[in-house]
Regions:
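Conserved GNAT acetyl-CoA-binding A-motif
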Residues: 127-136
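Residue-level marker for beta-strand->alpha-helix junctions and adjacent short loops that shape enzyme
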Residues: 89, 140-142
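GNAT-family acyltransferases
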Residues: 1-106, 119-123, 127
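Glycine-centered helix-boundary capping/hinge motifs
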Residues: 64, 109-111, 129, 152
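Conserved acetyl-CoA-binding loop-helix of GNAT-fold acetyltransferases
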Residues: 101, 109-123, 142-150
Length: 153
């Protein structure tokens, strides 16, 4: 891998870090959860989920940032991902850098998405010196919209 393997962003309760092979089973379970994936086209298979995690790590290796694995600091339990992703040509407002998150449903409503996203925004503006970060979600996804509002987006 690369030097980015040891990089981590820490908050009071969370660690955002490079992906590890032992994250894949919990990530696959999260991506197979119909409740978590209800605003996406379909839940992911194990193979699709593993490929997504590998792609996230490749982006981190290439750029030094991306969608990081998120774990609880006190237990090192994987709870999902949060991070930044370049969207070069996908939208009318591209190129842009988006912030995104996806957490296991058992960790919802505890402030983890907001806490992790705040750390990512700090990284985006203070370290990467970005002028703007965007966020978007399905109109029906009120929980993600609430996180965006708490972030000032």
């Amino acid at each position: 891998m690369s030097a980015h393997l040891n990089f981590a962003i820490e908050t009071a309760r969370l660690r955002l870090r490079a992906w590890r092979a032992d994250d894949f089973p919990a990530f696959a379970q999260l991506n197979a959860d119909a409740q978590v994936m209800r605003y996406f086209p379909h839940p992911l298979t194990q193979t699709e989920s593993d490929a997504l995690a590998q792609m996230f790590q490749q982006f981190i290796n290439q750029n030094g940032w991306g969608f990081w694995a998120v774990e609880l600091k006190h237990s090192q339990e994987f709870i999902g991902f949060t991070g930044l992703h370049a969207q070069p040509e996908c939208f009318d407002f591209s190129p842009c850098v988006e912030i995104g998150w996806r957490l296991d449903s058992k960790f919802w409503h505890q402030g983890y998405a907001t806490e992790a996203a705040q750390a990512c925004l700090y990284f985006a503006f203070s370290v990467l010196k970005l002028d703007e970060v965007v966020a978007f979600t399905a109109v029906q996804n009120r929980a993600s919209e609430a996180v965006m509002k708490r972030l000032g987006m």
